Amino acid sequence: RARKIYRHEIGNFKDKDKLIFEEKSEAFTVSIGLSSDEKYYFINTSDHNTSEQYYFNVDESDPLPKLIMKRDRGVLYSTSSWDGKFYNHTNKNAEDFKIDITDSLEKQDWKPFILSKKEVLIGGLTFLKNWIIRSETSNALDKLFVRNISTNLEQELIFSDETIYVPGVSLVQRDRDTDEVYLGYSSPKTPSRVYKYNLSNKSKILVKEQEIPSGHNPENYIV
């Protein structure tokens, strides 16, 4: 299990690396990731049902990770940052998760962003300059929702006329200043497809489709 995080300065030898975080519990595994806005590093330490996070600014030359919320058995959470705000995806007092928002991790004045819903699994967030995309799962069906940041209006992102399908979003480019995302989906009667989708005008272009060597016609199937 990964238990330590070191700071390495490019050009220096490994023995010069500085330990900045160490997990004492053998049951927990440590990972580190860059925030969506590339302003913070988040250190995550967790086992299968409990997590704890620390953060520090990317500009810190001598990082001192700060605790976000102390671990609480059975509570999972994951914090992200975007446009001066912090978002916390957690199952604290929310069996199927919720998302809270705050302007400061020091004050932690958390307010609801996405409320928990009965028998609806709330997924995480994907950030673009003008949009926030998130997922939900209910009745074994996955859905995507897109929120316009300037208007704060949210609507379901529907890009297929099929009732039963599995959608997903992938950012294949690092540029967040765009209205275009790559959306993939598959269904019981349709092979996997990837579309380039414009969130602003809702246009889509098919860019990839799974080939079935024996041939396949979706119209021959009823779901």
Spans of features found by a protein language model:
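Short loop/turn segments immediately following beta-strands, especially the blade-tip
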Residues: 9-13, 57-61, 102-106, 199-202
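Polar, glycine-rich mid-to-C-terminal structural blocks
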Residues: 2-46
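Hydrophobic, well-ordered secondary-structure elements that form the walls
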Residues: 99, 132, 194
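Non-catalytic accessory segments flanking enzyme active sites
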Residues: 29-57, 62-80, 112, 123-124, ...
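Beta-strand C-termini and the immediately following turn/loop, strongest in propeller blades
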Residues: 1, 9, 42-48, 56-58, ...
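Generic long, charged, amphipathic alpha-helical segments
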Residues: 108-128, 137
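Extended hydrophobic/aromatic segments used for targeting, binding, or gating
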Residues: 63-117
